[in-house]
Amino acid sequence: MKTPLAPTKSNLAYVRDQLGLARDGYRLLEQKREILFMELTSLLEEVHLLETELDKRRKQAYASLWQLLLAQGRDDIAACALVTPVPCRVQQEVLLIAGLRFLRLDAVMQPPKLQYAALGSSACMDRAREDFGLLLQTLTRMASVQTIVWRLASEMRKTQRRVNALSKQIIPQMCETCMYIESVLEERDRESTFVLKSLKARKDPTTTL
């Protein structure tokens, strides 16, 4: 505590109360930091797995597209794409981590409403559509998890700064203030005791100081 306080019993009680609150806050922030760290570690492992899956899905999707180009040509593919929308629904899941609210998104692919067999398509079209749908699902999941990771990392940095401020500045300053007030009050008590004994000694010469 940078502001000096008068060394009184009431101020000592006040500082002790504040010190207790600061220590409680420190323990709660430590618990929050540990929870954030565990969740962040778990999500980083998930990101690593998603990166591997994403690389696999991307290679498979573009391989299917290449096969489709060889089988049907660019013009037929463009014609099918114009008349065949690919429905995609986004699911939202609310996650609560250490009192924080996050949204996790997942893309759910649905069968196309219009069949395009009459346009001269082949099984390659179905395979390419399916592979790119899986790629979109993985991309959506990856973006969602990475956003949560970024927010968790940001929150963890803020929590760590608060923990450091409490442990290295606020709590030590409060302890120092408590010790200062206690020492002054003890010195006053000793002086008061000495004065009382001196007064008694004057009244009764047999009294020992």
UniProtKB/Swiss-Prot annotation:
<dbReference type="GO" id="GO:0046933">
    <property type="term" value="F:proton-transporting ATP synthase activity, rotational mechanism"/>
</dbReference>
<comment type="similarity">
    <text>Belongs to the V-ATPase D subunit family.</text>
</comment>
<dbReference type="GO" id="GO:0042777">
    <property type="term" value="P:proton motive force-driven plasma membrane ATP synthesis"/>
</dbReference>
<comment type="function">
    <text>Produces ATP from ADP in the presence of a proton gradient across the membrane.</text>
</comment>
<keyword id="KW-0406">Ion transport</keyword>
<keyword id="KW-0813">Transport</keyword>
<dbReference type="Pfam" id="PF01813">
    <property type="entry name" value="ATP-synt_D"/>
</dbReference>
<keyword id="KW-0066">ATP synthesis</keyword>
<protein>
    <recommendedName>
        <fullName>V-type ATP synthase subunit D 2</fullName>
    </recommendedName>
</protein>
<dbReference type="InterPro" id="IPR002699">
    <property type="entry name" value="V_ATPase_D"/>
</dbReference>
<keyword id="KW-0375">Hydrogen ion transport</keyword>
<dbReference type="GO" id="GO:0005524">
    <property type="term" value="F:ATP binding"/>
</dbReference>
<dbReference type="GO" id="GO:0046961">
    <property type="term" value="F:proton-transporting ATPase activity, rotational mechanism"/>
</dbReference>
